[in-house]
């Protein structure tokens, strides 16, 4: 619910005044209604802050002003201009931080929101099967996946590349409930930390209540993936020395759903260092973040399911004591011959290529059996995609003809 009074916003009048001053410094004059909207707050909530700016001589009214939105309220329709003393004051405020955006949400409100929006959805076998129906997986693997997803427990997915580990983790994210609300930014003892990130958060277009607090964004439960580029530094708030505010660490952006450490063991930081950094958060659902620029630390809520995906044996990455902290370790095996056939047939339908037993057997006899090549779940789709592109280039219909198979496979397999 949108805060009706200044105190309901969780921010003092002086803080709101500074935020307003930064906005009007870059865009002057401004109509009162749109000035308040820049902070994503109702006009009546910021009225005391506007009055404070006028009383101190940092802004002045210029009478009624036409704005982008029509207002029938006299106060909302007033226009304001920043004064010369106001510009000097704004520069002082900007020297502290360059954050110009929606008013941040108090940290306590953020913490309460994260805890309140922990998914309570019970994942049934039927739900899991439906979510993974686009993959060909054994019933045994589905049974193994159910308990950790239900418990939102840390999970190791390991096995050869190309068998769907990342896709499995992504599909599980769809099971963890309805969209959630996250703030654009949070206020931690006067320090601003941006939380909403369009790279990781997908907005949900839905009619929201009239009195909705616009400082919050409705997003799909986030599936946040970090690959080989991940370092321990990215698991701490990043402070921009130029802008002088913080960006939330990547795993905190996954609150409410899944944080995937993809290709675990290939990062610049060692597996042990990464696990050491995350172990408290995994066990206590709290991560202690250091705000280096402010010389302070805060215990932030961490309510994400952590999935480690690796092509390596978990035992080769960390010792037994660490493995004990990640109770669920599930091997994603190569497809069986029957499963590989099913995957191939499904890929044929996707590319509208008529499946023939002769063509399929040619692939196996020519490119698998002589090399004792293991089956991988990604291969049928990759091969047929390549065959489809070759056929298009040659002006031929895509079919499981031996020459088209040869052209596709020779450019796909290193050893062919």
Spans of features found by a protein language model:
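Dynamic helix-loop-helix/coil hinge segments at AAA+ ATPase domain boundaries and subdomain interfaces
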Residues: 113-142, 370-371
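C-terminal engagement/docking regions of AAA+ P-loop ATPases
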Residues: 401-416
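Short acidic, hydrophobic short linear motifs in intrinsically disordered regions
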Residues: 26-38
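Conserved ASCE/P-loop NTPase catalytic core
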Residues: 129-307
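A short helix-turn-beta junction within AAA+ P-loop NTPase domains corresponding to the substrate/partner-engaging
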Residues: 277, 318-334
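Interdomain "pre-motor" coupling segment immediately N-terminal to P-loop NTPase/helicase cores
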Residues: 49-120
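Conserved AAA+ ATPase small/helical "lid" subdomain
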Residues: 344-405
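Short alpha-helical segments that sit at the start of domains
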Residues: 1-19
